[in-house]
Amino acid sequence: MKTAQIRQKFLDYFESKGHTIESSASLIPHNDKTLLFVNAGMVLFKDVFSGVEKRPYMRAVSVQRCVRAGGKHNDLENVGYTARHHTFFEMLGNFSFGDYFKREAIYYAWEFLTKELNLPKEKLWVSVFEEDDEAENIWINEIGFPKNRISRCGTKDNFWQMGDTGPCGPSSEIFYDYGEHIAGGPPGHADEDGDRYIEIWNLVFTQFDKQEDGHLKPLAVPCVDTGMGLERLAAVLQHKNNNYDTDGFQSLVKAIVNLTPKSNNIKNNNASVRVIADHIRSTAFMIVDGVNPSNEGRGYVLRRIIRRGIRHGHKMGIDKVFFYRLAPVLALEFKDAYPELKQALPKVEKVLKREEQRFSQTLDQGMRLLEDAITNLNGSEIDGKTVFKLYDTYGFPIDLTADIARERHLTIDMLGFEFEMTRQRDRARQAGDFKISKKNVDIIGVTEFLGYEQLENISSILALVKNSKLVEEIKAGEYGIVVLAQSSFYAESGGQVGDSGVLSNAKIEFKVDHTNKQKSGVFEHYGVLNKGVLKVGDTIQANVDKKSRKCIARNHSATHLLHAALRIVLGETVTQKGSLVDSEKLRFDFSHDEVITKSDINKIEGMINRKILGNTKVHTDIINIENAKKKDAIALFGEKYSDTVRVLTMGKDDFSVELCGGTHVKQLGDIGLFRITSESGVSAGVRRIEALTGYDAYQFDNQMQNSLSEISQMTKSNNAQVVEKVTQFIKQQKELEEQITIFQKQLTSNQGDDLIGQVQEVRNIKLLSTVVEGSSGKDLRNIADKLKDKLGSAVIVLAVVSNDKVSLVVGVTKDLTKRYQAVKILNYVAEQIGGKGGGRPDMAQGGGTQPEYLAKALASVKSLI
């Protein structure tokens, strides 16, 4: 059974059992700062399980895209070396929110596996929590499962919990037995870590609420959460004991093999093939969901995975940019399940190619540093300073270095690496991840927001946080988080950044950098205490930075006007895809398939500025969600709204009507001026506009005018003529470049004639091994081709030095390729000058970084003849 068929059969089966199908969500968790990526199907329903959210259904089924790389669930280091670890996988799951429980969950799982998929009953094994007699009785007495194939396991294996406190419960796992020919024992046995018994389905019965004292309080409404890896199930059904041998990976594996030099032994690089096949899956989908390579957070996880894949490609002998070439193969594989990948393919290819080109510049240098360190090792551990230098200077993620070390049966000095890292850590990171438990919220209370009406207020301090822990006081110079009873500070939400400002009284001053808000309603004021000692219970004056707030309000209101104008000019298919509003600028992402013309940009700008000049009042209404819909108020797709919503109306004839919790101007004239500074594509079908308002927009216009005046002076024209004048210059430049190309070709031809005089005869073979002066690396191949034609039979080695780098070309005429291969001669020379290359028996190209050894290297070619 094909993977696509399994995926659909699972959804169809549970839909027939009254489950609502939930499409796979983004890999980026919605409104959840505790996770870098969605790593299980239940992540979509965390708030439902914890009682924070209610859905219009009580049964759900999903096939969720997941990533496990970074954080608590990190499979990255195992990928490639095992049969079943992946950074990206699909999780099949069925869920009950207070509807059915253990009996139905077990029955559905059993029926789906044995009747829908026809798995042999005798090949299955089950585990239950050691204290869960109920689940075991259902398996034995109602399903008829043999007791001798049930393992009772402890908390580590068969008890699930969301966190240190909160929803939790026992689980029952279903395993598949691959047979006696594979080593390993059943769950709960000493040899359970073998590959014979493989877990395929985990049924979690969430029936308790774990208290802070460890007590398990029964939930009033127990739930079911199950998870089954699609790749593992496909391996079972396709009679493979390695996930990478299933149909879902074969097109990728073939593409990787085709990219690998024929001389390379693929069998010796199976791990590398698996690494690359896995990593293109996770990286492509991360990019589709809006992640870009960076040096922190999700972006750094993406960068680590891309670079690990690239390194394994180089290990297999792939010396060209290759990783992005696998994206179209992947898009074809998932064209029906996830068509969004095909839609975003140009962006995926662009991001992957750019990242590989960037890393390729330092990969070879970093590998040389690492090879030198390994050569000079006294023991079996690579020192922390070297590991850090690879990370900091050459862009080697720590797990990539660890990966290479493991291949050499070495380890890395993590303590030494961490010591070096501490010197670079930002003080702001001391605050760490912070979450007040539900129990503490009940005791402390939530923050009352006053910021719509006022920018300052007096409040008591409810709680203080330092180094991720609740504390009683914060001292001068320390970074921390302050929780207030009432606050005028707006907390980051809906694309609008949180407020900054000062919390103070006669003795203390706490500078607030930014403000966040937890789902519970607790406002977190992040910052540093400049003077005094701040204590829980103190009374302070909270003062929002007024200038910053006014700038933010201008930009936020302008964003609403922009959204409305886009829908009028481009059509109502325009929907918001994301936004950023801060004190300096606004950024707005929206759905649209084409580049916006200059004419349309002018229309949009003009429309918005006319609304600003109209200076109408901005109206705010708190109304029922149904009434808001009747007013055609724009709501953000994917956002969850309460029954009562805040509606902002701007301009005559209700020009803009949107649901919004942000802060805004009182009159549209307060925006002052609106100017679009850029329009670009973000991904397939998504465009981005960046803009300025107020004095920032005026300064932008002023700079543009000054630049135009400077160009006019340089081109000896006035502002009205400058475009025509620059167009003439560009045309002239193009004509000159064409003439230069003609002259270069003539020069190249003449150089070939000049070099014939340097040809030597070595053992009756014509040999030319020399530096070509006044040429570029691009010219060498043409010169070599002309020399081969003129000499008839020869070995030609040409080099050129530019900016302390050597370019090499080796040409061998066809009659000599059985005795002398260009690629072997090239690598012989390149190794002596710190480089490498590649090519065919008759023509090869490469280079090096040590020109001081070039003369000796060229002279040594004679010894090969």
Curated annotation (Swiss-Prot):
UniProt-listed Pfam families: DHHA1, tRNA-synt_2c, tRNA_SAD
Keywords, in A-Z order: Aminoacyl-tRNA synthetase, ATP-binding, Cytoplasm, Ligase, Metal-binding, Nucleotide-binding, Protein biosynthesis, RNA-binding, tRNA-binding, Zinc
Keyword presence, Metal-binding: yes
Protein name (database record): Alanine--tRNA ligase
Positions that bind Zn(2+): H556, H560, C660, H664
Cofactor section: Zn(2+)
Taxonomic source organism: Ruthia magnifica subsp. Calyptogena magnifica
Gene Ontology terms for molecular function: alanine-tRNA ligase activity; aminoacyl-tRNA deacylase activity; ATP binding; tRNA binding; zinc ion binding
Function: Catalyzes the attachment of alanine to tRNA(Ala) in a two-step reaction: alanine is first activated by ATP to form Ala-AMP and then transferred to the acceptor end of tRNA(Ala). Also edits incorrectly charged Ser-tRNA(Ala) and Gly-tRNA(Ala) via its editing domain.
